[in-house]
Amino acid sequence: MMKTLAFIRRPLSHMPGLAAACILTVLLSGCQSIDTEGLVASNAPPEISGPAASAIAGDMVSRLAEQIGPGKATVALKVDTSPFGQALEAALKGWGYAVVTDQKTDSGMTIVTLAYVIISFDGQVLARLSTNSVELGRAYTVTSTGATATSALSLMRRG
């Protein structure tokens, strides 16, 4: 471990301390991800309008379908009472997924556990969908009549 740190520290010694610390933090944080067993908590702020929630949910579910296949599995989803939670459930059903919200399913079914998080940040909304095998994220600009993607899709696959 010490040899590895010395190897990293040597090239960074020519940079100012703050830049070196930032680079090292980014490198080390790339090794972390959320626990895949804890994908049942979902959260979205209630102040996102229905049309904006529908636009975000529709876009994110279409991207999820590209990764796991359209309508090929039952999705286990713990929905909150926000407009986004309801819009996400409707979008999943629109893409042909069976949705269970009580976390109880038949033992022979293929289940995809799905969690979502919506965070307001700096005038935008950050949306994230997480499953045991893939995590999708994207930023949106929200208006009262809808939402527009303002970033590329972030995709992380798990082994």
Swiss-Prot record:
For membrane topology, the record states: Lipid-anchor
Lipidated positions (N-palmitoyl cysteine) are C22
- Coiled coil ranges (UniProt) are none
Recorded hits in PROSITE patterns, A to Z, give:
PROKAR_LIPOPROTEIN (PS51257)
The organism's superkingdom is given as Bacteria
Q: Does the keyword Cell membrane apply?
A: yes
Sites of S-diacylglycerol cysteine lipid attachment are C22
Write out the annotated subcellular location: Cell membrane
* The UniProt record lists the keyword Transmembrane: no
Instruction: Provide this UniProt record's keywords sorted from A to Z.
Output: Cell membrane, Conjugation, Lipoprotein, Membrane, Palmitate, Plasmid, Signal
Cellular component GO terms held in the UniProt record: plasma membrane
Which residues does UniProt assign to the signal peptide?
A: 1-21
What is the protein name for this chain?
Answer: Conjugal transfer protein TrbH
Q: To which species is this protein native?
A: Rhizobium radiobacter
Q: What is the lineage of its organism?
A: Bacteria, Pseudomonadati, Pseudomonadota, Alphaproteobacteria, Hyphomicrobiales
